[in-house]
Amino acid sequence: MKIKEKTMEELELFEAASKDLFDTMQGFKDNLPVQFPLLDSDNWQYDKGSIKVCKADESGFKKRCRVGISYNLKVSLLNEDAEQIWLLFKDWFNTSRLGQVERNPNNEDLGRYVFSASSPLGDQVDCSIYLPNEWNIPQISFSGYLIARYRACDLDKLQE
């Protein structure tokens, strides 16, 4: 699935940026079963998150952000799988607007892999993989959030 390119101007709007984040996360999740058939499951749990409304600015308009967007699947993966998912994550998000990709190796010896991709504006997607062991419930999850932006209708009123 190829995601339509959006201009930076479009992504300054809450609706466009929100849809782009959903599409990017969904695209990555849907692409994983190609290499990992184990992840082709109907048991993925999805949470569309919630919209938080900021205090009104000096113009009387309120920005909105979206938090808690997530996909989660309880599944047992191996170290090699986590390494391969990291490579896919890096490739997928390097070509998106969330091009600042990094890996946090701090807890990998405990079987916990964490990858994140963020935009220069501050939007972010995290991928967490917990391998089976005495401290972890084996799973893979993606979570994302969108920083505060104006809705399109508010921006139109601001420009009048």
Regions inferred by a protein language model and the residue ranges of each:
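Ser/Thr-rich, low-complexity intrinsically disordered terminal regions
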Residues: D42-A56, V101-V125, I129
